[in-house]
UniProtKB/Swiss-Prot annotation:
Organism from which the protein derives: Synechococcus elongatus (strain ATCC 33912 / PCC 7942 / FACHB-805) (Anacystis nidulans R2)
Protein name: Ferredoxin--nitrite reductase
Top EC group: oxidoreductase
Keyword set, alphabetical order: 4Fe-4S, Electron transport, Heme, Iron, Iron-sulfur, Metal-binding, Nitrate assimilation, Oxidoreductase, Transport
UniProt-listed Enzyme Commission number(s): 1.7.7.1
Domain of life of the native organism: Bacteria
Catalytic activity from the UniProt record: 6 oxidized [2Fe-2S]-[ferredoxin] + NH4(+) + 2 H2O = nitrite + 6 reduced [2Fe-2S]-[ferredoxin] + 8 H(+)
Disulfide-bond pairs as recorded: none
Regions annotated as coiled coil: none
Gene behind this protein: nirA
Gene3D superfamilies xrefs: 3.90.480.20, Sulfite Reductase Hemoprotein, domain 1 (3.30.413.10)
Annotated positions binding siroheme: 441
InterPro entries in the record: Cbl_synth_CobG-like, NIR_SIR_4Fe-4S, NiRdtase/SiRdtase_haem-b_fer, Nit/Sulf_reduc_fer-like_dom_sf, NO2/SO3_Rdtase_4Fe4S_dom, NO2/SO3_Rdtase_4Fe4S_sf, NO2/SO3_Rdtase_FeS/sirohaem_BS
Binding site for [4Fe-4S] cluster: 396, 402, 437, 441
BP GO terms, sorted: nitrate assimilation
Length: 512
């Protein structure tokens, strides 16, 4: 079991919690918890340690837990979707499913007494929720069209799966990496368009050739938090596209685990260690942990604008297509899971993929099947060609389920996009990201227009409002947007956004 290095700094409360009992220890107690019920559980186990199993206590819905899965590269099979739906249907309207900004699924409605069965059912279909919350490595993201995209440089699917298997002991839980100083995000891009937002991950691999061999440049330290936002910086390192990626990821995680600050929780992400040491020393220590000198970075190859993958696109396999469907703010019902599985089986080869824009992609659709697929009733709700504001709308969970939230996000995001679309003609999609609080789960800094929940004063009353970010650029030459307006009341937002869309994004008022 890995331990934090002895330190003179005062440990934060989560470090004390982990010292009292390792997070992963709840794995062996889940049957006991299920039998005693949530009210009788130790609050530390219930509200924090269960997150090591991906089970989240929701203060907003006491007794109804959320389960966050791990879906490497966002790739699912129809039998997995069916298994999730079969389990969730017992909860009726209490069940709902969200596609997350890390191309993952979160399931809601779960009762504690059902968790042992739930975890067994996940494992039976090759899924896991282990280590998906708290001080663990989050879902590892990759291009959602890996293996399909004719322009891709490297198919990252098996590498990402192998990395997840290594860091989680094939989904059973790996105590080497369950006591990091903080959460840790990893992304591996194999395409040309930076589809995974490499720049906002603690560790990202982006494709690059070294002496004719394809491998990855390495980026470190990207993160968002309520007090600081930092894009990843180059480690000036290159590794071949093989097991070296796993070795280097392990080395960086070990360096972070053993040296990262465990004091002020707001200063515990990887970038703070890099700041403290400087990138040269950090690189040196990582190289020692890696056990070999690191090659210098090679020229970057990502030179495409980011795609959203919606609509019909030919695959590199002749005669087959992938079809991206827009799922408004990523929200699904149990019935939707069944329907997506059915479409994948009927028209494709049983595969469904998720994107960091909270959408789905059906893959391997033969040319001849396209017209019938496009006429399926589900596609009237999950459109392959959504209107330009809905198309680019992403939203975090918000106050419906998240107790950090300062505002309701998802329903408001849909309503505002639809009302502005009805009034305006837009020359191109505009990416609007909503996030309910400064934790930035909805990534407002990568959006054309980012909306961050805030409490604002209007007419002497505190009301729900937002701070507005502008100028986020994704894909080639990605950079983060910056706060441009503060304290806009949500009820004034349609007017403010209308003006922004006209002035900056070429929107024109529709003549009725
Ligand atoms: Fe997040 C905490 C939801 C992506 C930064 N995030 C939370 C919690 C767990 C808080 C809580 O316990 O209620 C939220 C759960 C609410 C719920 O019931 O759904 C939550 N985060 C989400 C999701 C579901 C947003 C979404 O609607 O898609 C995303 C799940 C991703 C996944 O599948 O693992 C999600 N969170 C992100 C991202 C975006 C990303 O990874 O690209 C970020 C910013 C990037 C980053 O982390 O550097 C993000 N979440 C945070 C933070 C701030 C971290 C920090 O260093 O301060 C918190 C708060 C914390 O960890 O203390 C947080
Ligand atoms: Fe919750 Fe805030 Fe994250 Fe939204 S940004 S899911 S409100 S923690």
């Amino acid at each position: 079991m890995a331990q934090a290095t002895a330190t003179t700094e005062k440990l934060n409360k989560f470090e004390k919690l982990k010292l009292e009992k390792d997070g992963l220890a709840v794995r062996d107690q889940i049957q006991h918890f299920a039998s005693i019920g949530w009210e009788a559980m130790d609050p530390g186990d219930r509200e924090h340690r269960l997150k090591w199993l991906g089970i989240f206590w929701r203060p907003v819905t006491p007794g109804r837990f959320m389960a966050r899965l791990r879906i490497p590269s966002g790739i699912l099979q129809s039998q997995q979707l069916n298994a999730l739906a079969n389990f969730l249907q017992r909860y009726g309207d209490q069940a709902s499913i969200d596609i997350t900004t890390r191309q993952n699924l979160q399931l809601r409605g779960l009762l504690l007494e059902d968790t042992p069965e739930f975890l067994e059912r996940l494992h039976a279909v090759g899924l896991t929720s282990v280590q998906s919350g708290m001080d663990n490595v989050r879902n590892i993201t990759g291009s959602p069209v890996a293996g399909l995209d004719a322009a891709e440089l490297f198919d990252t699917r098996s590498l990402i799966q192998a990395l997840q298997d290594d860091l989680t002991a094939a989904g059973q839980g790996n105590s080497e990496f369950t006591n990091l100083p903080r959460k840790f995000n990893i992304a591996i891009e194999g395409g040309r368009d930076n589809s995974i937002h490499a720049e906002i991950n603690d560790l990202a691999f982006t494709p690059a050739y070294q002496d004719g061999t394809l491998g990855f440049n390495v980026w470190v330290g990207g993160f968002f938090s309520s007090t600081r936002v930092a894009p990843a910086i180059p480690l000036n390192a290159w590794v071949p596209a093989d097991h070296s990626v796993i070795r280097l990821s392990r080395a960086i995680l070990e360096v972070f685990r053993d040296n990262g600050s465990r004091g002020n929780r707001q200063k515990t992400r990887l970038m703070w260690l890099i700041d403290e040491w400087g990138i040269e020393r950090f690189r040196q220590v990582v190289s020692e942990a890696y056990g070999a000198p690191l090659a210098a970075a090679a020229p970057e190859l990502m030179d495409w604008e980011k795609r959203d993958f919606l609509g019909v696109h030919p695959q590199k396999q002749a005669g087959l297509n992938f079809v991206g469907l827009h799922v408004p703010v990523g929200r699904l019902t149990t019935e939707d899971l069944y329907e997506l599985a059915r479409l994948a089986d009927t028209y494709g080869q049983g595969e469904v993929r998720l994107t960091v824009e909270q959408n789905v992609i059906l893959t391997h659709i033969p040319d001849a099947q396209l017209p019938t697929l496009l006429a399926e009733p589900l596609l009237t709700r999950f459109s392959p060609q959504p209107a330009p504001l809905s198309r680019g709308t992403v939203s975090c969970t918000g106050s419906q389920y998240c107790n950090f939230a300062l505002i309701e996000t998802k329903q408001r995001a849909i309503a505002i996009a639809q009302s502005l679309e009805a009034e305006l003609d837009l020359p191109r999609p505009v990416r609007i990201h909503w996030t309910g609080c400064p934790n930035s789960c909805g990534q407002p800094q990568v959006a054309d227009i980012g909306l961050m929940g805030a409490k604002v004063r209007k007419d002497g009353q505190m009301v729900e409002g937002v701070d507005i970010f502008l100028g986020g650029k994704v894909g080639y030459d990605a950079h983060l947007g910056e706060k441009a307006m503060t304290g806009v009341a949500c009820e004034d937002l349609p007017d403010v956004l209308r003006q922004l869309l006209i002035e900056r994004f070429g929107a024109q008022a529709r003549s009725h």
